[in-house]
Amino acid sequence: MSGHELNDVDFISSTHEAELIITWFQKHGINDLLLICGASLGAHVAAEILQKQRTFAQYAMIESLKAYQYKGIILKLFSYIGNKVIKKCASTKGYMDGTYNQKYASDDAKCTINNMNKKTLENIMIESGNYQIKQQKTKIFAETMILYGSKEKKECKSNTEILQKQIEKCTIVEIPKYRHGELAIGNPYKHLEYLKKLISQGSI
């Protein structure tokens, strides 16, 4: 994703990211995908892709479609303070260790955050603070599983319900005692189990 690696490309928004991905696949003549997945910010991007290209993939797995729905000055403060806090957390020795049960996951998260520039982090915080799934009547054909942890249910509820209404066949999964993004980042084997069930059975 733009802004997440050692390059000069900033993350702008999930909408912009979705357009880049769709364009890349069109340019390379790839139009028959089995699966699209996204967690956290990636969930926003995956949702945008499905809304723009309703036949983009046969299956979709979306985790932690979260937003706080902040507006105006509150959103600006959230972006400004959040930018500084997340950088501080990533640079403080031991602070994020074990956040996702796996040390490699914490190390990878810290490395990624420390490599982000100010503009990318600001845009990510704004996206996280006010992202809202677009209302539309066009149906999405990908058989979809939307997951979230019970500890983030309140923040995920609105976007999940809006997107669910736009999908022909959709399963909602609430994972007990899980936090934001904990499935994909901290428990990859369990994440893979959900993927296998979605593809092999069509639902769980």
PLM-predicted stretches and their roles:
Residues 37-46:
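Gly/Ala-rich beta-loop-alpha elbow adjacent to hydrolase catalytic centers
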Residues 164-181:
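Catalytic histidine neighborhood in serine/cysteine hydrolases
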Residues 7, 178-190:
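Catalytic histidine-centered segment of alpha/beta-hydrolase-like enzymes
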Residues 72-73, 87-138:
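Conserved alpha/beta-hydrolase catalytic His-Asp/Glu region
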Residues 153-159:
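Conserved alpha/beta-hydrolase "acid-adjacent" motif
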Residues 1-34:
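Active-site loop/oxyanion-hole signature of alpha/beta-hydrolase fold enzymes
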Residues 140, 146-148:
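Short beta-strand/loop motif that positions the catalytic acidic residue
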Residues 51-86:
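Flexible "cap/lid" loop of the alpha/beta hydrolase fold
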